[in-house]
């Protein structure tokens, strides 16, 4: 172990989280806590009645790429128009999903500062308004269920063929559980599909190594239903369909855009087992253990199946080797994002609203014991014709794109 990864590995809680990777639980071969988390029905049941009853979005309400955020707005845990402040995002995601406060503050602040007004942002929207226009700096290719921007001309369309790929991995409704083991397999399939079908596929330092992994891990970690029998959570077919706005029988599934719903009698993860940044890091490492390529930045070069890796040392001007980035992907991704901010925004790290994001990112890297990246070499990304910092929610379909 080198000095770069020693600080985080020395953390007792992080060590305990890593131990779960070698354990199996009743639901199957998936990484789960060594000791089942507590279950408290009264505190974990999420209210979906009264003020929090499902209300379909109206014509002026924003609904975008993230099914969880759409569901929060549909149940009025976020403002129903889909535009919320940093504090509102933090409150809703921690209260309803059991997201760790550190992760919630990180994601909410980044979204508001880079893709919003500085203090608020939209769960849809275009560039500098919300997540819909964040392709290249936040939203990314190889989503679990949503379309690659340059493959389909949209980054917010749910592709039913992709949903079927995941849904059909658990054929028996009585025992179905879309846990992390299932999602790891699906993650690998989707990564390869973007290589095979999206000529402008980009897997970036922050958008790929961190954000795109979250799109998969969050499905199980935040959508599973918890119980006394299964305190770790089970994500069955009906709950998955509800959160993804899918209805109908298995031979005729239908997607209704923006109608994501929290199911009745749904119990979130216990906040004593909050999904923190170190917790998320161990899930990334579980994913990459089966596919080391997920640890490497890369892209297609304008045609399908032309994927090339880009060396972490080149991108970080020697601050991280490829092995160091792979050992601690959150450190590399966050430090890269931090070093990239001046070029991304045209502002200094201490100026105005950017100072608040700098403070949040610096807190993350300090707690993880990360080595700083003094400057980034974004010219290395010139290899990637699909690379941009602000794109979406629509774009021309790339020549040669293959649609499922």
Residue ranges of model-derived segments:
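Polar/charged low-complexity regulatory segments
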Residues: 1-63, 67-68, 78-404
